[in-house]
Amino acid sequence: MSAPLADIDPDIAGLLGQELGRQRDTLEMIASENFVPRAVLQAQGSVLTNKYAEGLPGRRYYGGCEYVDVVENIARDRAKALFGADFANVQPHSGAQANAAVLHALMTPGERLLGLDLANGGHLTHGMKLNFSGKLYDVGFYGVDPTTHLIDMDAVRAKALEFRPKVIIAGWSAYPRVLDFAAFASIADEVGAKLWVDMAHFAGLVAAGLHPSPVPHADVVSTTVHKTLGGPRSGLILGKQEYAKSINSAVFPGQQGGPLMHVIAAKAVALKIAGTEEFADRQRRTLSGARILAERLSGADVAAAGVSVVSGGTDVHLVLVDLRNSELDGQAAEDLLHEIGITVNRNAVPNDPRPPMVTSGLRVGTPALATRGFGDAEFSEVADVIATALAGGRGADLAALRDRVTRLARDFPLYEGLEDWALVGR
């Protein structure tokens, strides 16, 4: 029981060490990824992993929950206070589980759901035909303007009036602009629909007061905790008090059994951190870095190589890069940046002609580097590295670019001493 991981399972310990090395030595720019503080790692790796706690605080189906009840209540209270919500459920294991619970609570199978098309930046759980949401519900989609790549609220209203959905989703996985939540709420009211906002990507910006909050406008709001919020991989649901009972029962027993109490403890820690000035500063650097990146990727040298920025810029933590006129497709560009030590993900651009495993775009995000400590100077440097790589393609001096990446990574050490604590138990 007391032997460290390195002694019990050197294979897994070795792989964890290699992954730690990868995270330290490269620049993480996948928009949905971040680095959690050591306090979050400690909470998630705690003895709470041993405890079953089906039900809600004060109404459990197991004994011995006197301490985990307090932990969950702290997490719920912090979520409500941070976002100004009437209620919070912190039990969802993931964002997808949270979204499934929201749909389960607000709709019955066969009813109509209106969301942003996956091909235009929506998410799998917003009605994609191979996802549960697309199989259980009658789904309609709105999209972006083919020229501006912005959501046209007049077009959303027209679609809602025609389709008459039971629920309208406002949220995205790859859309670089702020949504008009008041307009979505007005449309939902006009057609008699419920408004659900999925703020998984921008919740940290909302918490810091740097992005409009959907909470005053939406009936229900879902989010992950691990993107801009910088917490453990998990989800939570917020909303109006009138939906608390149906949401709670949709999570348990509707979608899940026992909650992961060690993860809920880690959520509580992350939510506390999200109320600090240090967190707000990180979010300001996240936004500034994304704008620096968008501006550099709009430069003449990059444009000459057929690379452009979708919608002409960004309001959030990510930049969507259009490679349709470039010699590179999304997969090739992802691989190219991987070679120089920058991790991004290929991503479809609006109405992408290429298949989803190839794509014609990249999604590039700044949260993880802001968490690591990057400011404007460092974001300017990494933006220039990316621009140089994409403009030069396979003809770029990859060794020189890799050296620049290595210097940036070394200037911002990550998880110093973590091997002693996490792998060998010292």
UniProtKB/Swiss-Prot annotation:
Its main location: cytoplasm. The record marks 226 as: Plays an important role in substrate specificity. Signal peptide: none annotated. Pfam families: SHMT (PF00464). It is an enzyme of class 2 (transferase). Pathway: One-carbon metabolism; tetrahydrofolate interconversion; Amino-acid biosynthesis; glycine biosynthesis; glycine from L-serine: step 1/1. Its EC number is 2.1.2.1. One of its GO terms (molecular function) is glycine hydroxymethyltransferase activity. Keywords: Amino-acid biosynthesis, Cytoplasm, One-carbon metabolism, Pyridoxal phosphate, Transferase. Its cofactor is pyridoxal 5'-phosphate. GO terms for biological process: glycine biosynthetic process from serine; tetrahydrofolate interconversion. The keyword Electron transport does not apply. It catalyses: (6R)-5,10-methylene-5,6,7,8-tetrahydrofolate + glycine + H2O = (6S)-5,6,7,8-tetrahydrofolate + L-serine. GO terms for cellular component: cytosol. The keyword Membrane does not apply. InterPro entries: PyrdxlP-dep_Trfase, PyrdxlP-dep_Trfase_major, PyrdxlP-dep_Trfase_small, Ser_HO-MeTrfase, Ser_HO-MeTrfase-like, Ser_HO-MeTrfase_PLP_BS, SHMT-like_dom. Belongs to the SHMT family. Homodimer. Catalyzes the reversible interconversion of serine and glycine with tetrahydrofolate (THF) serving as the one-carbon carrier. This reaction serves as the major source of one-carbon groups required for the biosynthesis of purines, thymidylate, methionine, and other important biomolecules. Also exhibits THF-independent aldolase activity toward beta-hydroxyamino acids, producing glycine and aldehydes, via a retro-aldol mechanism. This is Serine hydroxymethyltransferase. It comes from Mycobacterium avium (strain 104). The gene is glyA.
